[in-house]
Amino acid sequence: MAPHEKGVNPSESPSGSLKKAPPSGPKALRGFASPSAFRNADIGNGLLQHRGEDERISFAFPRKGKESLDRNGERPAPMSLESRLGPPVSRFNRPVGGDSLERGNGKGGWDNRDERTSASSSSIHRINKEKIRPRSDFIESSANLYSEDDRNRDRGRYHERDRSRGTNGDRGGGEGHSHREPGRGKEHQNGQGRDRSLYRDHSRERESSRDERDRYSEEYKHQRSKARFSPSPSPERSRLKSSLGRHRSPVSVSSSSSSSARSPPPVQNREPLRYNGSQSKNGEKELSNGLLENSISRSGVSIAVPRKLETKQLVRPSPPHVNLKSTIQDNPSPPTGKYPPSPPSLDILSKPSCNREPLPDQRPPTPPLPENSSPTSPSLESSRFDQNQHLLPDELPLPPLSISFPQKPVSSSSLSRLSSLSAALSRPNPLDKDGTSMPPSFHFREISTRHQRLSPPNNAENQLPETSIIPPPPSETVPEPPWIRPPYIPPPCTKHRPGIGNFFITNLREKVEDKSGKEEKRVDGMEGGKVVQVTDPRLSMTEEQRGRGRGSSKQRAAFYELTYEWDLYSVTPKPPSPPTAVLITGLGPLTTVDQITKFLRPHGRIKEIDSKVDRKTGMQLGICWVKFEGPPLGRPGTAHDVASMAVKVCDGKKISMGGERIRVVLDGRGKRAEQAVKEEMERRYPPKKPSALPSDMKVTPLSGTAMATTSRPPNAPNASTPLIDKQTFDTSAKAPIIRPGVLKPLGQKMYHRPSAPPLVFNNHRFRDESFLNRPFNAGAGMISQQQMGYKILPGKPVQQLASSFTSAPFVRHPRERREDSWTNERGRRLKGESSTRHWRARSLSRSSYSSYSSYSSYSEESEEERPRHPTKVPYPQRKRLATGPSKEDEYKMEDVREAIRENGHPCVFIDAKSLPAAREYESYLRDHFKAFRPTEIIHSHLGWYILFADDTTAYRVQRVLDTTAVQGHRLSLVVHTSSGPRAQTDASEPVTGGVGESKKGNWRYLTITKKSRPMPAVKKSGKSATIRRKVYSPSVSGSDDDDEQVPVMAQNRKRAPSYASSTSPLSEDDRPFARSVQREERDIDKEGKFSLIGKKEDVVSVKAAKGPKSKTIRVDSDEVEENQGVPLASIGEVTKAEGKQDDSTVVKLETLLSESISELTKGKKRPTKAKGGKATKKVRLDQEADDAATKIQIDEDIVPQPPKKKKVVKTEVDKLLASGVLMDEEDAYWLGRVLAAQEDGLEPIWSDGEEDLVDEGHPLFHKSGAWRAEGWKKVAQVQKSRYLPQRNRAVVNSEDVGGITTGRTARLAGRDQHRQTAAVAANNTVESDLFAFNQLRIRKKQLRFARSAIEGYGLYAMETIHAGEMVCEYVGDLVRATVADVREQRYLKQGIGSSYLFRIDNDIVCDATFKGSVSRLINHSCDPSANAKIIKVNGQSKIVIYAERTLYPGEEILYDYKFPLESDPALRVPCLCGAATCRGWLN
């Protein structure tokens, strides 16, 4: 077949410029230079790109039709790529034409020679023609795609071509092509050519498969684009889409180098323009696939876009907003009418309808418009052009009526869509049968409008004429009147009936003619013309009837209170979450956490457990706080349910072996636990109080009047203060006398005050005063303790003042009122006044404040609940209670005193606040104290008294059972001591405390000293005289006497700090005076006056009255000096007297004359210590003036002397006020606090941090003022007993040595003495020891470790251990002696205080330093209570501790270390056991 018959351009020849270019892209036709490759190619609108030197040309091919004709009806000639643009450029930017034509992807190429043979030329054309075959041909014959080329290669045509190439020499061979040697004209006959051919064949096959995939992809895209334009399968729409697709012009891009003038004019018909190519050189037009090869128009290739598509198919009307863009004017005028104009009709918006029938309307009907309303014009701001819009309000501006939109040039990508829209606009609008226009198809479709001005295109046919729409004038309508709400007419059933409205039922019968009626009738609140009063019928019921019924039928007595759970809408604050924790109290000291956990584990899962311990000693407080996490696994409920169940079940149960019954309460937030710990610590470490009264003083019985006077109940006694001192009780006494109106409990001291806040002076005026810059003592400042009437107390820790001091109002009172309150009220007649006048609480003495604070039943936390004095005073005071114990309580208390007196041994007192004094608790107390074998358990309104048969049991009971619980009550044990019954001849003067008052009389003093003038002896007589005594507080000092007759106080002396133990009682020498000896007034109703006058103030005056047989003796008893005091208890015996005054008591002058007055006449010096080296005590007498009169038998020969008149002397307080030191009541208030604190023995806390310095001989003495500046020094163990509370038992003095070893050395070397006894003990093991050891394994003894008074910690017995019983085993690590020596040195370097090495024999040492039990804490004593033995058990040595004597609960276990004696004094260790038989040294 000729080349021209196959579509090959005849101009292409072997000498032509067309070069062979194999395919290089994914498509088969990409990169081909021959125009014939485009013939019959079904590739759609694909682009073939060819790179030129400076520009890129894109070609578009029509999708439909095998051949394309030009406007003349002929096929265009193929286009030469080299005609105007030059040789083509390969993908590597190298020219393909003149020199070489490369294959795609560098697979090889041939040189372009003009000297090819005809066979070579025809072969090249054949290959090119096969390469540009249509894609369908490639698909159909993909197997033998290049079969003809293979046959040509077999025939040797390629060899001929290669030989023809060889004539011109070697030029530009590609990669992998045949190479020839230089200078030769033939090709090498080797395997390289065959390999190159095979590789080319495989490349073509791969390219064909890629072309097939690309074709399927293009077909899929084409179908997708067709589906987008034809959503419905209607035949009309399908024909329209096929027409649009058939006449769509291909997309093309003209060359950038060609001008727009060269582009052909646009075609006016409906067919798309084709590319116009130039004719061939011979003038013949050759058909090409859309390309005209013309040298003139080669560079200017353009595309004509169709402007309109005039089809006869029916198209739905276009949207109104599209037509409005061309019909509405640009500058609309504002509307003039009130209502918006009616919208233009559809005739204006649409084209005249054509003769075609409209399509059937398948949309829902348009809703009708409201009455008297017209459709509004479309708004530009709205995206929906709905004709059924509501009327616009009057105030809003109306939208423009006519707007013109200039058209904007449309991009080529949207030309087809705009063409269809333009065609739709030009079509007439179909009409319905009735002549109305059909609504547009997108009436209910939301179409967004773009307010953009479209620039008109160059083509005039696309421009639509701009028309203005003139709206019709608005219709004149009359506005409707405003709407008024009509009155509400309720339904007939809700109409109000006449009458009050109270309806009830009566039993009236109304008979009608037929004799039928109703027994009940409803009446509108009226009966007989009167209003019926409605009453509750339950009020007429009896109590029995109201109590009948069950459940809801039972009559309710009151309204039920409804409760609701708290939520976010509740007005009350959110309550705390339900408690999930419990507080356990009353635990034994040996109860462990494991026991508590085991006890509570069955109730629920425990989340947290906190056992409270003593912060000072580390001992258990018996308080435990347990928090639950929830119920046990598998059980329903919450943690609160578990805690509630634990409280119900566990309260009152026993946990440990001690038998203590615990108390369990809910404590979700731990507040109760904190309060319980605080109270327990305060109970264990109470603030120090002044010591007890002297033991030689007796309690004076009350008279009948005093018994009738009521008193207030006492407070809880302090644990460290015994309630019963060594006192004797008179059998004839009904109750002890305290002072008028107050009953003193058994042995309670009256001078105690409650704890007070720290006293800190921050006032600048106080800082400027010299007497306030140091702690108060006997001689400091301008006001001394003796001048203010205070006794000297030993050093005490800082306590807190009562809160009443801080709550005093500062009210200024008249001067005379203040003087009367602060003075001794000289000259006041007390005859018509009350005998129990309230004293000011601010009094500087032991006034009503101290007595109230000690015996008030109110707590310190509830001061506002305490009764107050009705009169206002400038300083705090407390009012005495008007009630007291009943007569039965007093009688029972007297029986208790009698039982204690008969027992004669110390007893244990339990306050009623700790355990109620009820008879049902007696059996529980007997079980609680049965181990100590109490002789009797009695109780009164004050509490319980447990009596024992010896003097030591009470102390052991206090040490062991203190803070234990009985029936959920924590016991507070206090030991009371009693000296037992005494003869009545030895009875002393009654001792009273507090402040008493008399109805008349002034102050008088009687000072009894060692220096008194001789006086005649007073004989015993049967006559009696009445003595009235009145004792006032020294704080309200001042009298009619002169300055020289002011009572002589004790001499000033500095108070040394006290380092006594808080747990042990003070020695007899350390006990301070309980009361100061006060002034005493005695009026003896006798004729005449007599006085016992000594030197200066030593006066005993007796004033005679006017009665014929009455004498008055005034005795002014002053405070006795410290070394010269005479106990007033030796005045005489108090008995009941007979006479006119039943309340009087008779004081026999036998003791008065023999012991007191006789020594005044002799002038003998009294001993410095009254009893057993005891310091002289100060005593204050307090008795009712009218109720406690005494009769003294005196001799009538005594001549009394009239006393001298004394001038009024100002008191110290008056001097302070006059001097200006106290400016106002506030200064006096703070001074009162200072003096009250000093009275209690409190040390003030100064703001500058000053403190008292100890003596130079004290171990803690330092000169620099700071311990850090003193350096480190070692304090001997003996010296620690002087200031450590737990070391007060070490009383044995030892000589000072240079090097004193510690307990570590003692224990290290202490087991050497067992060398000799170890072997003997191991060989001579008795069966009793083995039996005791086996018994220990069965039941261990209850032991407890705590701070020891000897050294460090000690081991105490918690149960009775009889002699010979095994106590415990000394457990430790058994090592050789050499290893023990190494460990000893290691312990010394580590600073371990004790090594606890116990030598068993010469080779084995038991080391309990890190591996041991509590047995290693047993201390040494020269008087041991146990001993250590080494026994053999199954061939193994055991160290066992046995009791030598009976060990009682609370007693420390001690044994003798038996160290060998040391000759070197530096190695000797002092002994601190404090026993009576102490040797002084351990070795």
From Swiss-Prot:
GO terms for cellular component: chromosome; Set1C/COMPASS complex. Keywords: Chromatin regulator, Chromosome, Methyltransferase, Nucleus, S-adenosyl-L-methionine, Transferase. Residues 250-262, 371-382, 411-427 have a biased composition (Low complexity). It catalyses: L-lysyl(4)-[histone H3] + 3 S-adenosyl-L-methionine = N(6),N(6),N(6)-trimethyl-L-lysyl(4)-[histone H3] + 3 S-adenosyl-L-homocysteine + 3 H(+); N(6)-methyl-L-lysyl(4)-[histone H3] + S-adenosyl-L-methionine = N(6),N(6)-dimethyl-L-lysyl(4)-[histone H3] + S-adenosyl-L-homocysteine + H(+); N(6),N(6)-dimethyl-L-lysyl(4)-[histone H3] + S-adenosyl-L-methionine = N(6),N(6),N(6)-trimethyl-L-lysyl(4)-[histone H3] + S-adenosyl-L-homocysteine + H(+). InterPro entries: COMPASS_Set1_N-SET, Nucleotide-bd_a/b_plait_sf, Post-SET_dom, RBD_domain_sf, RRM_dom, Set1-like, SET_assoc, SET_dom. It is found in: Nucleus; Chromosome. Residues 1-478, 677-699, 805-838, 858-891, 977-998, 1013-1082, 1163-1182 are annotated as: Disordered. One of its GO terms (biological process) is methylation. Its EC number is 2.1.1.354. Residues 64-74, 100-117, 127-138, 148-165, 172-222, 816-836, 1068-1082 have a biased composition (Basic and acidic residues). Residues 1467-1483 form the Post-SET domain. Residues 291-300, 455-464, 977-987 have a biased composition (Polar residues). Residues 1020-1031, 1163-1178 have a biased composition (Basic residues). Its main location: nucleus. CDD domains: RRM_spSet1p_like. Residues 332-344, 361-370 have a biased composition (Pro residues). Belongs to the class V-like SAM-binding methyltransferase superfamily. Component of the Set1C/COMPASS complex. Catalytic component of the COMPASS (Set1C) complex that specifically mono-, di- and trimethylates histone H3 to form H3K4me1/2/3. Binds RNAs which might negatively affect its histone methyltransferase activity. COMPASS recognizes ubiquitinated H2B on one face of the nucleosome which stimulates the methylation of H3 on the opposing face. This is Histone-lysine N-methyltransferase, H3 lysine-4 specific. It comes from Cryptococcus neoformans var. neoformans serotype D (strain JEC21 / ATCC MYA-565). The gene is SET1.
